């Protein structure tokens, strides 16, 4: 009897301990969200999405150029980062083997763990200095370097989950290996691959440090990929450290919009991940 009571008490104690640790994670997150909504919601209006920041001393304005700039940077980074990550994962999963593949995996893991500011410094050396100026292309390249290892490792793991019998059945019908990989293996893992892509986009959407060394920022519309471009994280950083209350309000509004976008991307990633589990 004493042994049974002890086991029940230990079970209740561990349950309470886990609940405390869970609350320790959730409470700060909820407080951050509540504070951002409290500070930024009042500044969200139509002008915020269609106007650029106004000069010092003038009220109103918005972050339309930052929204467009972030969308452009993410699009350009995805054009380079997603294909490289996916085809690299296909090589590792379907064709690779031995020390070279292990070297690629190790390099991807190291790259994903490098502070993003170092990635920005590398992009600055490789693109900004030779081009003699900050640009959207340099910013997109820096974000692509962050994106590639996430897409690569996620896609590789998803491809490994595809049953080998599907590959064997396709090959037995005389389908070439490359066609089997693209039409059977990759298609079967598509929902999982989408999860990795969305997580990578959510990661780079909020990056600020690499853009300070590459895109720099712009108070106006950018019409050339070889000139500095505005981005939401850069504008939030710039407005938050300014001494002007109007810019502080814009910074909080921008933070709310950016957090909402990242939250939506995370929910979409979870949706595709759940579809993948249900498919299995």
Q: Model segments located where?
A:
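Transmembrane alpha-helices
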Residues: 175-214
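Cytoplasmic-entry segments and transmembrane alpha-helices of multi-pass inner-membrane transporters
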Residues: 84-123, 150-157, 279-280
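Short helix-to-coil transition segments within interhelical loops
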Residues: 95, 159-165, 169-189
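C-terminal transmembrane helix and the adjacent membrane-cytosol boundary/short C-terminal tail
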Residues: 13-14, 156-160, 195-198, 238-280
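Transmembrane alpha-helix signature in integral membrane proteins
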Residues: 61-91
């Amino acid at each position: 009897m004493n042994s049974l009571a002890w086991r029940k008490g230990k079970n209740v104690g561990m349950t309470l301990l886990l609940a405390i640790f869970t609350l320790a994670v959730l409470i700060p997150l909820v407080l951050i969200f509540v504070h951002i909504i409290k500070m930024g919601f009042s500044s969200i209006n139509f002008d915020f999405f269609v106007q650029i920041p106004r000069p010092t001393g003038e009220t109103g304005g918005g972050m339309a150029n930052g929204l467009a700039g972030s969308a452009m940077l993410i699009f350009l980074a995805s054009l380079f980062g997603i294909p490289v990550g996916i085809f690299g994962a296909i090589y590792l999963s379907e064709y690779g083997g031995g020390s070279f593949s292990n070297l690629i995996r190790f390099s991807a893991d190291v790259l994903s763990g490098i502070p993003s500011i170092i990635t920005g410094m590398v992009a600055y050396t490789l693109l900004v200095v030779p081009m003699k100026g900050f640009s959207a292309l340099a910013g997109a390249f820096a974000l692509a370097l962050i994106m590639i290892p996430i897409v690569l490792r996620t896609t590789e793991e998803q491809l490994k989950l595809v049953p080998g019998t599907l590959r064997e059945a396709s090959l037995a019908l005389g389908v070439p290996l490359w066609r089997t990989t693209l039409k059977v293996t990759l298609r079967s893992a598509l929902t999982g691959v989408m999860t990795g892509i969305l997580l990578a986009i959510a990661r780079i959407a909020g990056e600020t440090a690499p853009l300070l060394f590459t895109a720099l920022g712009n108070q106006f519309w950018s019409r050339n990929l070889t000139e500095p471009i505005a981005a939401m994280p850069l504008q939030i950083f710039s407005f938050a450290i300014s001494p002007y209350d109007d810019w502080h309000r814009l910074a909080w509004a921008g933070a709310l919009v950016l957090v909402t976008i990242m939250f939506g991307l995370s929910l979409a990633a979870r949706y595709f991940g759940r579809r993948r589990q249900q498919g299995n």
